Design a protein with these regions (language model features):
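A compositional/biophysical signature of low hydrophobicity enriched in polar/charged and small residues
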Residues: 1-81
Length: 81
């Protein structure tokens, strides 16, 4: 499995609706509300052969209330168990 993170900027007043939609879709491992330029930080895992760009385009960016996304590809988790 390949982990990656997506920062999500929501339309005004839509952060909780977007977070709930992600949770209901059962595609995210973890969902956090954040302060700063983005409203949510979401951790995903996909199979090694999954096209991450296509996954984000087809499963994440189509959710109502999302204004912008920023994807973070990770390499190694330190201290992971």
């Amino acid at each position: 499995m390949v982990p990656f993170f997506v920062q999500i900027k929501c339309k005004l007043g839509q952060s909780y609706a977007v977070a709930n939609a992600l949770a209901e879709a059962e595609i995210a491992s973890e969902i956090y509300s954040t302060a700063g330029d983005y409203d949510l930080l979401v951790k995903f895992y996909v199979d090694n052969d999954t096209d991450i760009g296509h996954f984000i385009n087809e499963k994440v960016q189509v959710l109502p209330g999302i204004q912008d996304t920023h994807t973070i590809i990770t390499f190694k988790a330190f201290g992971a168990r």
